[in-house]
Amino acid sequence: MTTGAPPFSGSSPQTTRPQTVAEKILSQRGSAAVYAGDLAVVEVDQVMVVDSIAQSFIERMERDLGAVPKYPERVSIVVDHVAPASTVSVAQAQKEAREYAAKTGVRLFDVGRGICHQVLMEEKLAQPGWIVLGSDSHSTTYGAVAAFGSGMGATDIALAAASGKTWLRVPESVKVTLTGDLRPGVTAKDVALEMIRVLGADGATYQSVEIHAGDRFTRGERMTLANLCVEAGAKAGLVVPGGEILTDYGYDVPAWVYPDEGAAYAREVEIDLSALHPRMSAPSEVDNVHDVAELRGLKVDQVFIGTCTNGRIEDLHAAAEVLRGRRVDPTTRLLVIPASSQVMEEALQDGTLLTLQRAGAVLGTPGCGPCMGRHQGVLAPGEVCVSTSNRNFIGRMGDKDAHIYLASPAVAAATAVMGRVALPEDVAQVAASA
């Protein structure tokens, strides 16, 4: 099945002043040049529906609109949020999603294929310059490849599927410039958390966060950066292509997708990467960010490595590097859930999963796992969890009295070994003194 995305016109709409990346994409996918504050009607290249909203989506399509997807090849249903099904009602909803996909010809990525954003990226269903709408708030992830990715509810998603288009107000853009080089042990997750700290939890509400990273970071690391943008309230998170980063993965990067010099930004911030240390978000807001060293020693009941933020192969490699030849602390549980079946297969083939399992990790089916607190490792009252996920709100992963700390895979793995918040060097020091 082809992507079915409408071809680019080959020439950009006539503009009157410099544009940001968001303005360029929305102009290219619309009928005229648009700028922040304008209303735009645009072509949608891919619509993504997750299992937890599939029933509502189907109801909107069939009962409210009396419609079928205009372009079935541009619609994907992903069973990932509660997969495998945890209750009869969840199983019924997933059954209806499968039946709908078979009836209408839309793509179906069923139980075990993985998390929606990881799967669509692997399937190349997000491309530079595209508009990708998802029924999941972390659809900003597609900005890793300079696609305008944004989360919407069932009604807007259904309208986009039925018509092939959507309308929206063109967002203002916030320019985030990354300078310097990362210290050893500092990762893209630390950069993302620092970015949210600087912007604030609502500091980019209905804005496009445009990240200027040069040729730094892999595609997976760029996914982490774009993924977290919604935690500042962003409508989209766009990482400007740099060097050969995207072409190395086989993407065709159109020349027009880069921002113009002199484009107007609502706000500009600069982050010096060389000044960063490993970071951790403490309860119960993502922008409550501290150096890990400040929280070192906090007792932890559960560690979770996975999600659309940090469940990729490089994340599992980072965790395995810390855990190799060691054991998880007996008072701490370690859950590891690969972001997709492709990640799981690669981790099986190179021995990563064996390393994790021998260390005492509990391995789960590719998918969202306990991230949203519905199955596969929810937290009891008073429990403390260090997670590589993207949200630490009250009640997010289980009981409202549980406490969630967000960190990188390496810090999460070190914490699992020590049973307390720790850095990888803490694990190495203990081993050296043994």
From Swiss-Prot:
GO terms for molecular function: 3-isopropylmalate dehydratase activity; 4 iron, 4 sulfur cluster binding; metal ion binding. SUPFAM superfamilies: Aconitase iron-sulfur domain. Belongs to the aconitase/IPM isomerase family. LeuC type 2 subfamily. It catalyses: (2R,3S)-3-isopropylmalate = (2S)-2-isopropylmalate. Its cofactor is [4Fe-4S] cluster. InterPro entries: Acnase/IPM_dHydase_lsu_aba_1/3, Acoase/IPM_deHydtase_lsu_aba, Aconitase_4Fe-4S_BS, Aconitase_4Fe-4S_dom, HAcnase/IPMdehydase_lsu_prok, Homoacnase/IPMdehydase_lsu, IPM_dehydratase_rel_enz. Disulfide bonds: none annotated. HAMAP family: LeuC_type2. Binds 1 [4Fe-4S] cluster per subunit. GO terms for biological process: L-leucine biosynthetic process. The gene is leuC1. Its EC number is 4.2.1.33. The keyword Iron applies. Catalyzes the isomerization between 2-isopropylmalate and 3-isopropylmalate, via the formation of 2-isopropylmaleate. This is 3-isopropylmalate dehydratase large subunit 1. PANTHER family: 3-ISOPROPYLMALATE DEHYDRATASE LARGE SUBUNIT 1, HOMOACONITASE, MITOCHONDRIAL-RELATED.
